[in-house]
Swiss-Prot record:
InterPro entries reported in the protein's UniProt record: Urease_beta-like, Urease_betasu_sf, Urease_subunit
Protein name per UniProt: Urease subunit beta
Record's subcellular location: Cytoplasm
Pfam families cross-referenced by the UniProt entry: Urease_beta (PF00699)
Length: 104
């Protein structure tokens, strides 16, 4: 074994297995491409992206960690979102006020 080496189990690994999924249509109304990373709280994505932000509350893209989706200007596309997990707190983006996503 090499230090840091990871051995995965045989078979297919399903990302976000069992997580509820939400599909939303998104259009980039800006004049430049926009990329959104895998763990961005989707409603906080660039405001040139037009979609139902309230339906996306507490959700992120259903894509592998460290990847992103690129939205070209004027092009509509459908994305699949899954709930943010863990403590469900978002800090350092545009959430006003930052912090817990769910009411306490």
């Amino acid at each position: 074994m090499i230090p840091g080496e990871v051995f995965c189990a045989e078979g297919v690994i399903e990302l976000n297995e069992g997580a509820p999924r939400t599909e939303l249509d998104v259009v980039n109304t800006g004049d430049r491409p926009v990329q959104v990373g895998s763990h961005v709280h989707f409603p906080q994505a660039n405001h040139a992206l037009q979609f139902d932000r309230s339906a996306a509350h507490g959700l992120r893209l259903d894509i592998p960690a460290g990847t992103a989706v690129r939205f070209e200007p004027g092009i509509a596309q459908t994305v699949v979102l899954v709930p943010l997990r863990g403590t469900r707190e978002v800090h350092g983006l545009s959430l006003t006020p930052p912090g817990k996503l769910d009411a306490s």
